[in-house]
Amino acid sequence: MEPVASNIQVLLQAAEFLERREREAEHGYASLCPHHSPGTVCRRRKPPLQAPGALNSGRSVHNELEKRRRAQLKRCLEQLRQQMPLGVDCTRYTTLSLLRRARVHIQKLEEQEQQARRLKEKLRSKQQSLQQQLEQLQGLPGARERERLRADSLDSSGLSSERSDSDQEDLEVDVESLVFGTETELLQSFSAGREHSYSHSTCAWL
């Protein structure tokens, strides 16, 4: 923004100089030298005598340079007019008013840029602080220990559930074997009792 502001300042000075020259040409008087102290009168120096051809040549060169400078200044002002947020009556603006509005607009843009930079730095510091807090929380031994205990508890609960299922299956197998074994023993004892009674009855008949 600084080079643009310096260019605007140069354009302001050039516009003021041109307007002053135009007013002087209209009224037909010359202005005082601006750099002398008050009370001193600017004295005109007599130009040295030159040949008429050289005088005309120098004047034509000066006019050509002045024409180029005015054309360049006009192009710059037109580009500035296109970039400025002007209103509806932008055609009424003079060169000086346009340059003043451009300077005010540049100052506003610089203020907005500074505010954006401050906000960016604030957000960056906040992000760094949150990142540090996250790293501290991840690096705490208590957090790691809690995570390890949680994993161990999940593993132990899985093993206990598997053991309970296997114990239940063993218990069912034992109960079935006990039931089947009892029935077999009862059948064997019953058949043995019947054979014993048959033997006693046979002996009695004999």
Swiss-Prot record:
It is found in: Nucleus. GO terms for cellular component: RNA polymerase II transcription regulator complex. InterPro entries: bHLH_dom, HLH_DNA-bd_sf. One of its GO terms (biological process) is negative regulation of transcription by RNA polymerase II. Expressed only in the proliferating areas of the testis and thymus. SMART domains: HLH. Gene3D superfamilies: Helix-loop-helix DNA-binding domain. Keywords: DNA-binding, Nucleus, Repressor, Transcription, Transcription regulation. GO terms for molecular function: DNA binding; protein dimerization activity. Residues 143-153 have a biased composition (Basic and acidic residues). Residues 126-138 have a biased composition (Low complexity). Pfam families: HLH (PF00010). The keyword Transcription regulation applies. Efficient DNA binding requires dimerization with another bHLH protein. Binds DNA as a heterodimer with MAX. Interacts with SIN3A AND SIN3B. Interacts with RNF17. Mice deficient for Mxd3 show increased sensitivity of neuronal and lymphoid cells to gamma-radiation induced apoptosis. Transcriptional repressor. Binds with MAX to form a sequence-specific DNA-binding protein complex which recognizes the core sequence 5'-CAC[GA]TG-3'. Antagonizes MYC transcriptional activity by competing for MAX and suppresses MYC dependent cell transformation. This is Max dimerization protein 3. The gene is Mxd3.
